Amino acid sequence: MSDSQTLVVKLGTSVLTGGSRRLNRAHIVELVRQCAQLHAAGHRIVIVTSGAIAAGREHLGYPELPATIASKQLLAAVGQSRLIQLWEQLFSIYGIHVGQMLLTRADMEDRERFLNARDTLRALLDNNIVPVINENDAVATAEIKVGDNDNLSALAAILAGADKLLLLTDQQGLFTADPRNNPQAELIKDVHGIDDALRAIAGDSVSGLGTGGMGTKLQAADVACRAGIDTIIAAGSRPGVIGDVMEGISVGTLFHAEATPLENRKRWIFGAPPAGEITVDEGATAAILERGSSLLPKGIKSVTGNFSRGEVIRICNLEGRDIAHGVTRYNSDALRRIAGHHSQQIDAILGYEYGPVAVHRDDMIIR
């Protein structure tokens, strides 16, 4: 084995269930065995697990997935305890302790909570404990959900300071077309930079029991790679897949980390789920993309959502394209009032000001 590395392993519902309505315990046992081998060799392992709702369905005997949020949260509440018990039981066979972390979008949006989550996660790793992370589906509504465990795993990789992120799924990796519909589809083994062509290839296929498709895996890979983390999409059913990834053996699709990763604060900005959105005019778009300028109120055309000063927001051009994320210096109500006005008018309009810019260039990430 090479020197000690930190690996985040994301296990989708389709991997944990094998496409059935029940957890595939035999397969989970094998995945734990692989992780335990790496742990014994000195590597640091983080598990991002799906499957809480599936575990709840199995335990309570629900034949179908309910449609209401309340019923899904009920299943998640029951299933989450079953799931962590399973991880704890299996890792204990190898004398390994696990620690549960349940996160929501709010933990990622707020810088202080983000840093607290980071400190907790790294404390677990420093004490040779395997963190088991999931979104807190029992309490998370649409407004506070990260959205899927692919993106959650990318955020976990940033929190952990990971070297690699492994997204295990029911597919071998990213193909040139959907291999389930096109027998001519070819596996893409290496990716250097994610563009619109790749996003179009990924589409939005979703497994029957999960919430993430190949499109969300590309989003996760984009976030992780820009933070300097190699990302691999591979089949969870492949024998020895986790160990092979750590050995550097070609498995699935490898998204190469950027040579110059984002600094720590900008990793948070890039990874945090946006709390809202603003649309800017052509002049502001050009200033941001071509000249690296801050965003002035004059260039703002509209504001969507309700957010506070200091939260991360999405900046879009007139066509709706996501061009940047940044930390806003004004809340949503204030931005609506000063949108389209010169910076010199801020104090007269609001009765106060936090400076002439809406989003400073130092607090902005170009998408």
Curated annotation (Swiss-Prot):
Any one GO molecular-function label of the UniProt entry: glutamate 5-kinase activity
SMART domains named among the record's database cross-references: PUA (SM00359)
Pfam families per the UniProt record, alphabetical: AA_kinase, PUA
Residues that coordinate or bind substrate: 50, 137, 149
Domain of life: Bacteria
Biological or metabolic pathway of the protein: Amino-acid biosynthesis; L-proline biosynthesis; L-glutamate 5-semialdehyde from L-glutamate: step 1/2
Entry GO terms, CC: cytosol
EC number, as in UniProt: 2.7.2.11
Limits of the PUA domain: 275-353
Catalytic activity: L-glutamate + ATP = L-glutamyl 5-phosphate + ADP
Binding of ATP, residues: 10, 169-170, 211-217
Entry keywords, A to Z: Amino-acid biosynthesis, ATP-binding, Cytoplasm, Kinase, Nucleotide-binding, Proline biosynthesis, Transferase
Cellular compartment(s): Cytoplasm
Function comment: Catalyzes the transfer of a phosphate group to glutamate to form L-glutamate 5-phosphate.
NCBIfam families for this protein: proB
Family statement: Belongs to the glutamate 5-kinase family.
Protein name, per record: Glutamate 5-kinase
Lineage: Bacteria, Pseudomonadati, Pseudomonadota, Gammaproteobacteria, Enterobacterales
Designated gene of the protein: proB
